[in-house]
Swiss-Prot record:
The lineage of its organism: Eukaryota, Metazoa, Chordata, Craniata, Vertebrata. Residues 523-535 have a biased composition (Polar residues). One of its GO terms (molecular function) is SH3 domain binding. One of its GO terms (biological process) is spindle organization. Component of the PI3K (PI3KC3/PI3K-III/class III phosphatidylinositol 3-kinase) complex II (PI3KC3-C2) in which the core composed of the catalytic subunit PIK3C3, the regulatory subunit PIK3R4 and BECN1 is associated with UVRAG; in the complex interacts directly with BECN1. PI3KC3-C2 can associate with further regulatory subunits such as RUBCN and probably SH3GLB1/Bif-1. Interacts with SH3GLB1; UVRAG bridges the interaction to BECN1 indicative for an association with the PI3K complex PI3KC3-C2. Interacts with RINT1. It comes from Homo sapiens. The gene is UVRAG. This is UV radiation resistance-associated gene protein.
Amino acid sequence: MSASASVGGPVPQPPPGPAAALPPGSAARALHVELPSQQRRLRHLRNIAARNIVNRNGHQLLDTYFTLHLCSTEKIYKEFYRSEVIKNSLNPTWRSLDFGIMPDRLDTSVSCFVVKIWGGKENIYQLLIEWKVCLDGLKYLGQQIHARNQNEIIFGLNDGYYGAPFEHKGYSNAQKTILLQVDQNCVRNSYDVFSLLRLHRAQCAIKQTQVTVQKIGKEIEEKLRLTSTSNELKKKSECLQLKILVLQNELERQKKALGREVALLHKQQIALQDKGSAFSAEHLKLQLQKESLNELRKECTAKRELFLKTNAQLTIRCRQLLSELSYIYPIDLNEHKDYFVCGVKLPNSEDFQAKDDGSIAVALGYTAHLVSMISFFLQVPLRYPIIHKGSRSTIKDNINDKLTEKEREFPLYPKGGEKLQFDYGVYLLNKNIAQLRYQHGLGTPDLRQTLPNLKNFMEHGLMVRCDRHHTSSAIPVPKRQSSIFGGADVGFSGGIPSPDKGHRKRASSENERLQYKTPPPSYNSALAQPVTTVPSMGETERKITSLSSSLDTSLDFSKENKKKGEDLVGSLNGGHANVHPSQEQGEALSGHRATVNGTLLPSEQAGSASVQLPGEFHPVSEAELCCTVEQAEEIIGLEATGFASGDQLEAFNCIPVDSAVAVECDEQVLGEFEEFSRRIYALNENVSSFRRPRRSSDK
């Protein structure tokens, strides 16, 4: 459905009247001046907008576009302009008209034309509004678009927006402004008739010239079409002549370049001969340098081996110190899931009670010393330094910038009303434990569990058992040539001085004597393990496999050791008495020279009866004659200081290990053997640091 209207019409001339002039020098300027003689043309049109479109298609919004048509009195011609489509709008404003896409011969001087607005959905459009517009009859609306009527079309011209006077549709009888106020300084004379005629003649001459140009252009094109064949042949001939000339010039240039290349070739041949002579001389130098490099490589290999040996010795020493540290400060767990350090209970940080202040201070002192020594051995500086003072140990916080220098030290013992400082000190200690765990790839989900975290770190991070009831993993004992390590250890030069003989302190009281007469649990368990334990079939196979490792096969035992081992096997198989040590036997053992920290030496072990279960027979072979690492270290330490003879380890064939060692090559066997040698050398260097002195000993 469309709305059709005719806007504009003949406008009557205004009656003559005086023109009121604005006062001189006034700054007021009229943006729009309605002149009676002003004419509006199609070329003055800038854009078109529609407002309040009535939609009768049932859609809330429409897609719209407009078309422009020229018209006469009886006929509307085909569209000469189509706008873009605006989606979903009943008040579209199309962009400015582009006269560049309009036909070239379009007469833009017309003032009457037809505007059709189309609307619809999904590419189905129908005519909504159709206006026949006379631009001279439009009404000025202002500098902005204002529309109040339905289906109203707004035309944007140079000086503002115009619309149809809806109060006088069809034919406008409204008179234009007859009173015009202008500045007198702006009044100028218009063109006279003769000037307009000159402009008209100039336009006609320009059009005539354009027609002449088009005519001459067509004539030229016709002549070119007729002479195109001959021109093509001439063009080809000239191109060939030009190519011949270019090729001749190129031939001359290539000849000159060839002469230069030949001369350069002779120079390069001479230079190449000189380089060949220099290369021969440098090759001789290289051979000499290779020989020197081989010597340096051998020296580097020797230094690298020395470095690896020293580094391995340092690592073994560190592991030994950590093992000793775990023996000094054992962490135990009872049946009530309570953790003890050196027999002193230490609950978690949130379970402290006031009645346990003394034991808590002692346990925290042990724990702080253990953490600080672990960090010292591992060469890992603690984030929060620990000041060890026994049960009055403290810890410092040098990180928090809100604390003064006097407030940075926190106690690790309950101290009156300073509960907050004590709790914070325990928190810093737990942070240090978490730091050590993080260094070894262990997380700390709960900081409050002080001893559980520390025990887990030592067992899983450092691979060290934290209680006294364990035996260390063992390594095979090589054949010993002398009781003193002056020149018997493999991988070390002779002449190493043995440490000075020292005397151990006597027990200061009878209680200490009784205390040190009792052997350590780890040594008793280690002594009883190969005798009283009846392994299952799987364990027996595993032990046999471990004893048959490459370390055992790489050792060269003397016939004398084998003979003593067979005698010891016979003595062990010959007796069947159970071992029941009494108090008197314990005192005798503590006073006997052949006991080491509560552990019988091989000479006494041979006289003891092995314990076997009834109904089962387990033959003791030569490979089962073994001792723990602790026993071997004690025996070697006493031999190094001169407290024992050099044949105590001869009866042992090996030291048991936890699992078999997979051997890929002889280098691995030699490396493991050198590791054992380094360990024995470290023990020989400083015997006193490997075992705590027993006060029950007289020496």
